[in-house]
């Protein structure tokens, strides 16, 4: 079993890995020992691989989800679970299905903005368990991280695309 301060669990590599790496570096610079691991393909083994103080998870909507995440309490009874909420909008303004229900309201929740924070409060999350932080993936569009991404000209050359045409890019796990 690996002892870490922070375990960041990712679900979708294409969506979450870059921001998990960014978060890992930021936490390591503050002296934390951090591991990143994927929830799949060995979801059932994940809670037995790590002993952590903080567990950063991609989602926790209801008790069924918490049945899994709470398995981490077995080896880390004081672990703090933080829901990064990689999905904060469900496309339905009258009822956001990404808001926590049941026991998932008791953990910490990252909020990208005031609207989601209001939804968290309405769903019964304690205000002290809401972390307003913005979307981690957007940090790559702000200095000094903008230089990490390749610009349109470089991408056009690399993939033999016409830089003057509109592109439609599809993100997928590779």
Locations of regions flagged by a protein language model:
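Short, surface-exposed loop and linker segments with low hydrophobicity and enrichment for Pro/Ser/Thr
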Residues: 1-2, 164
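Active-site and donor-binding regions of nucleotide-sugar-utilizing enzymes
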Residues: 3-149, 157, 170-173
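Conserved donor-binding/catalytic core segment of Leloir-type glycosyltransferases
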Residues: 162-174
């Amino acid at each position: 079993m690996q002892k870490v301060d922070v375990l960041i669990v990712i679900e979708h590599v294409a969506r979450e890995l870059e921001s998990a790496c960014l978060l890992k570096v930021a936490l390591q610079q503050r002296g934390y020992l951090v591991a990143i691991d994927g929830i799949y393909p060995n979801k059932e083994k994940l809670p037995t691989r790590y002993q952590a103080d903080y567990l950063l998870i991609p989602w926790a909507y209801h008790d069924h989800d918490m049945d899994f995440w709470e398995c981490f309490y077995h080896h880390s009874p004081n672990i703090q679970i933080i829901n990064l909420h990689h999905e904060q909008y469900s496309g339905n303004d009258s009822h956001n299905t990404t808001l926590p229900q049941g026991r998932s309201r008791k953990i910490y929740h990252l909020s990208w903005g005031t609207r989601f924070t209001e939804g968290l409060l309405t769903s019964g999350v304690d205000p002290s368990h809401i972390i307003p932080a913005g979307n981690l993936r957007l940090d790559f569009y702000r200095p000094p991280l903008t230089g990490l991404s390749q610009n349109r000209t470089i991408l056009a050359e690399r993939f033999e695309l016409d830089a003057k045409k509109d592109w439609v890019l599809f993100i997928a796990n590779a």
